Amino acid sequence: MGVGEKKESQKVAIITGASSGIGLECALMLLDQGYKVYALSRHATLCVALNHALCESVDIDVSDSNALKEVFSNISAKEKYCDVLINSAGYGVFGSVEDTPIEEVKKQFSVNFFALCEVVQFCLPLLKNKPHSKIFNLSSIAGRVSMLFLGHYSASKHALEAYSDALRLELKPFNVQVCLIEPGPVKSNWEKTAFSVENFESEDSLYALEVNAAKSFYSGVYQNALSPKAVAQKIVFLSMSQKIKARYLIGLKTQLLLALYQILPSSWYDSLFRLIVLKRKRDA
C-alpha cells in the first residue's frame, strides 16, 4: 500500500475538552481504534494519557477565536478531511438567575455555545470532504429540562439543542450527520467546577438557603453519577455506525425525568422538582 493510500484510509477525529472526562475517554477509545486524534483542551499537552503516536495534543482555550482559527489552519494543512468532531468542552455555572453576575453568564455562553459554533464553522470544510462524517455535540438533560439554580447552564444547553437541530437540517445535503448526546450527571470535573466555588448569593440573599440546599442535593446526586467512560463508549460506538439518530438521552433516571417533564402539567412538575431538590432544606 502506498503512502497516499494509507493516508486516505486513516480516520481522523477532532475532540474539544479532550484532557478530562468524556472528551478524554473518547480520545483514548478512538486512539485504540486506530484514529488519528487531535485533542484540543486548555491543558492537553499536560495529559500523560494522551501521549500516543496517533494523538496530537493542542493547548487551547476554545473561546479564543484567533487561537482557534490558527489551530484549524494547522490541522487543515495536515489533513484533507475529518471523520468525527466531538464537542465536549464545557462547564456549569451554579446559582440563582437573579444573583449570578452577567459577566459569568457571558462566560458560560462563550464556552458552552459560541466557542462550539466557531469550532463547527472551522471544521466543516474538513467534515464535508468525508462521506458520512459526524458531529457529536455534548448537551445534557439540562438541554431538555431546565434545572433549579442551573438556569444559565440550562439555557446554554437549550441553545445548543436548537442550534444542533438547525445544523442537522442544513448539513443533510452534504452527508454530514449531527448528533446530540444528552447524559444525566456524569462524574468529572464538571461538578467540582460548578459546586465547589463560593456561591454568588450573599448570606442575606433571598435565595441563599435554597441555593445551599440545592447544592447539597446535586453534590449527592453526583456521587452515583454516570462514568465518563460509559458515555464515551456510546459516542465511539455511534461514530462507527452508518446511521445515527438526532439525539441520545443517556441514563435511566434521565429518561424518567424527561418523561415526567413531558407528561405532568408544568405546575405539578415544578412542585415535584422543588420538593425533591430542596428536601434536605425542609428536613433541616
From Swiss-Prot:
Q: Which PANTHER family match?
A: NADPH-DEPENDENT 1-ACYLDIHYDROXYACETONE PHOSPHATE REDUCTASE (PTHR44169:SF6)
Sites binding substrate sit at 140
As for family, the record states: Belongs to the short-chain dehydrogenases/reductases (SDR) family.
Task: Please name the SUPFAM superfamilies in this protein's record.
Answer: NAD(P)-binding Rossmann-fold domains (SSF51735)
**What InterPro entries does UniProt report for this protein, alphabetically?**
NAD(P)-bd_dom_sf, Sc_DH/Rdtase_CS, SDR_fam
For this protein, the Enzyme Commission number is: 1.-.-.-
Question: Which domain of life does the UniProt lineage start with?
Answer: Bacteria
- Is Lyase found in the keyword set? no
Q: What is the lineage of its organism?
A: Bacteria, Pseudomonadati, Campylobacterota, Epsilonproteobacteria, Campylobacterales
Question: In the UniProt entry, which residues are flagged as the active site?
Answer: 153
Record keywords, A-Z? Oxidoreductase
Query: What is this protein called in UniProt?
Result: Probable short-chain type dehydrogenase/reductase VdlC
Q: Which residues bind NAD(+)?
A: 10-36
**Molecular function GO terms recorded:** oxidoreductase activity
What the entry lists under CDD domains is as follows:
17beta-HSD-like_SDR_c
Q: Does the keyword Oxidoreductase apply?
A: yes
- As given in the record, the signal peptide range reads none
